[in-house]
Amino acid sequence: MTLPYNTTADASDPVTLSRYNMIEQQIRPWNVLDTDVLDLLNVVRREDFVPPAYRGMAFMDMEIPLNPSAEEAQRLGQCMLAPRVEARLLQDLQVKPTDRVLEIGSGSGYMAALLAHRAEHVVTLEIVPDLVEFARENLLSAGIANVTVRQGDGARDAIPDGPFDVIVLSGSVHEVPQNLLALLREGG
């Protein structure tokens, strides 16, 4: 078997094979066909952004808890999105190299890392202090320098870094907060 896209990874490596299977069996069937996105999923190592207790699940088609305890995870609902959802978001956002991006809900920093490869700069906001630090550490370890991680509540706090070309909410809301809409550049 040879790996498609622009990877030089060894296909006999179990992690590389798991990543390949994730792309072929979860992401492509979800109509994510943008080769730049597929290449990026080979380059940004998802497993490095998953909490150590869940690394074995890094490529599974599921949301991965980001909180240390199941009780805290249920209370806060903090999780990594399923890989197919992350890939579809990345494809549909059509981020350009000149874009400034705001992400609400940093989590582990993985989505910010993906966005950073496509954008000029990413500002990511996280409400949970431990996850702010986790995202910062992960992004630093991955060598990603064009992301600013801030602690705050995207629905309530003032965000001084706008305007933005793209705003991503890595969670659910009943209604898009007006303060976020005000930060979106015209045409964004």
Regions found by a protein language model. Name each.
Residues 1-2, 107:
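Short, composition-biased local secondary-structure segments
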Residues 90-188:
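Conserved nucleotide-cofactor-binding alpha/beta core module
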